[in-house]
Amino acid sequence: MFLAKNLKNNKIKVCLPKKKFAALSTASIQTNERPNPDKVLKDIAKYVHETPLKSSLALDTARLCFLDTLGCGLAALKFKQAQNIIKPIVPGTIVPSGTKILGTSYVMDPVKGAFAIGTLIRWLDYNDCWLAAEWGHPSDNLGGILAVADHLSRLNKATHGKNGKQFLVKDVLEAMIKAHEIQGIIALENSFNKVGLDHVVLVKVATAGVVSKMLGLSQEQTIEALSQAFVDGQSLRTYRHAPNTGSRKSWAAGDAVSRAVNLAYLVKNANVGTIPSVLTARTWGFYDVLFKGKPFSFQQRSKYDSYVMENVLFKISFPAEFHAQTAVEAAVKAYRILAKQGKTFKDIKSIRIRTQEAAMRIIDKSGPLYNYADRDHCIQYMIAVPLITGNLTATDYSDEVARNPEIDNLRSKMYCIEDTHLTQNYHDPDKRSIGNALLIELNDGTQLDEIFVEYPVGHKFRREEGIPLLMNKFQRHLREHFVESPDKVDLIMKVSSKTNFLNMQIDKYMDLFTEG
């Protein structure tokens, strides 16, 4: 409808449109009724606060995971960049009753301490692994768990029990089991990588959940912290993939656990509030914004218990991205076979790598490799080095080693193909295999028998074989760090093996790992 004014007689003419207007929509009017918290938040919080842990296998595995993770953290200190990333922003800062950082003399607040510990234990990509629809390293959560447990224990002593809480090694292990479970169960069917998100979002969520209880928060406050973790800006996987692979992948988990600890403290100290439909809110929620409108699926396992810790994968033999572990093992076998025939890598014409879809997406890489992080996420590089030397170590990713032109020459002779059967077994919850096979053709036209390795030493199916090797790995990392203190190495090994180890105060145990 519009109006036209007759200027002569000052009359107003009403003009109606020929077509009727459509009924006005009120769909844009948003209701402000506060919903109940999303079920995912409630389920996690209930698990953290109410579910008792009864699995002796999970507890035994958690002890191995704990020791292995600490050893990996010490080993990271051999690298200058790792040292520089974790040091205090203000030099010389010592926080009263703060978190002690393993392998150093640093004493930090629990937020910065979580970043430092989380960064060290992830730096070498040598700690445990969980492979499902989403990949990840659940022991990353120890960065936040240990930082909070150590600080609260020291605070408890300093205030004669008035503040803080005394944590035992067993408390830390149980927190690890629950953090592993939260991260791993969500990862079973929900692929964050396929929407471009990094798996450390799950580290942030899992750490926020278990740390909330450690801080004495209620179940409702834990929901509050979890909602804040989900709404927090999530990391992109850009830094894990060509052509942008870089060192951030080595400190992303440290960043995630520090943010989780900070959020839990914000809930504790400032009651920052719950975002109840953080996942399900239309338009603005996590699902619509970041997950293409798809809610999380929990068809394989709908309950949280201790499944993930019981089935976690250990990296024992090589500091290699887990999808390449069996490929590296196959390469070492190939090196020995060639040696028996009086041949070397120089006799190789081509190498076919039969692998799983996940490896194709993550570590199949050609062209120049620019840094350590680039190399330890290239399956061709991780195969080439042991074919040349017979082994693969953390230093083999260094610039010095990478200058060897034979490595890139050998890389150029390799190609990957996906075996859908291997991909199927990779996702099979009863197998969880990570198979790789190498078919090597020599310059004289002969072929070696294909070398196939389906399960790495750290897999549950090879756990008994792996346990003594895992303890040797832990002891090796101790010896390499405490070179001038062999007695300290012996003491740590002795204490860590005692039957009453679980009842040791966590701060007393961590004192054994610090300097000064």
UniProtKB/Swiss-Prot annotation:
Pfam families membership: MmgE_PrpD_C, MmgE_PrpD_N
GO terms, molecular function: 2 iron, 2 sulfur cluster binding; 2-methylcitrate dehydratase activity
SUPFAM superfamilies the UniProt entry points to: 2-methylcitrate dehydratase PrpD
UniProt entry keywords in alphabetical sequence: Lyase
Reactions accelerated catalytically: (2S,3S)-2-methylcitrate = 2-methyl-cis-aconitate + H2O
Associated pathway: Organic acid metabolism; propanoate degradation
GO BP annotations, alphabetical order: propionate metabolic process; propionate metabolic process, methylcitrate cycle
Enzymatic class: lyase
Family stated for the protein in its record: Belongs to the PrpD family.
Note: Present with 2730 molecules/cell in log phase SD medium.
Protein name: Probable 2-methylcitrate dehydratase
Lineage of origin: Eukaryota, Fungi, Dikarya, Ascomycota, Saccharomycotina
